Amino acid sequence: MNHDAAYTAIQSLIAECAGDSDRFAERLRAERIPHLSFSQVSTVEACPYRYYLQYVRGIEPEPVPAYFTKGKLLHQLIARDYSNGHGEQPAYEEELALQVSGENLAHLLNALALHRQNAWRGVEVLGVEHPFVMSLEPDLPPVVGVIDLVLKDDDGYLLVDHKTGRSFYPDDELQVAIYARYIQQAYGENICRLFYDHYRWVNHLSRIRKPAFQRVEVRAEPTRWPRDLARIRAAYAQIREIWENGAPLRCGECFRCPYRGMCRS
């Protein structure tokens, strides 16, 4: 499938999935439509062998790390709150207790409380878990992503990405650049601000010494786009080689990798 056909196929898939980002991601994987994403770029940069396991062979980590489950659940709950317009706000405790327990349940309930204290208000919600596709240049596959929250105020567009973890981890400017590029293509708008809403997993909100929530604005610098595009091209060259030649050598920071228990020695 050439890049133009892939772009058209992904556009159709987004329309068919009607904003259901989980269904969109599942269909995209199942149908193996050629594409790139920020996650693919960052994964192949971190470890080509992890890319091979995750994207070529389609293997899920075993066992699934608890932070995967918690992160996905929190994203779903936050999306539901914004989709409901912050009207009725269920506690979700009984629902969550069917899926997680112990400190993992406490982590989620505390993060949900922090979200509700710090939710974006007084802005127009344009998209929740908003899937998109865009073409960067003819020699690259279409780029796909899902923006957690697309907002608009009097000054322009606000994009929000939710991050979860035991700590507040550094942000990657490439993700910001990709999102900003999409807004420019889709809306013809150059004023675009991106925020990371970070949630740190904690057992007790009343006992913490440092914040468990942090909102950080990250700016996309247009002058850096040539460098960002070069990074995407370099990652795509690695990805093509993996698809054509098979499993590469591992070379990542294994202690942080969810696949480390499955990785060859």
What are these regions (language model features)?
Residues 35-46, 135, 139-150, 220-229:
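An acidic intrinsically disordered interaction segment
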Residues 22-25, 43-54, 73-76, 80-93, ...:
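Short, compositionally biased low-complexity segments
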Residues 4-35:
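Charged, compositionally biased N-terminal leader segments and the immediate start
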Residues 184-265:
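Metal-dependent nuclease catalytic regions and adjoining charged, substrate-binding loops involved
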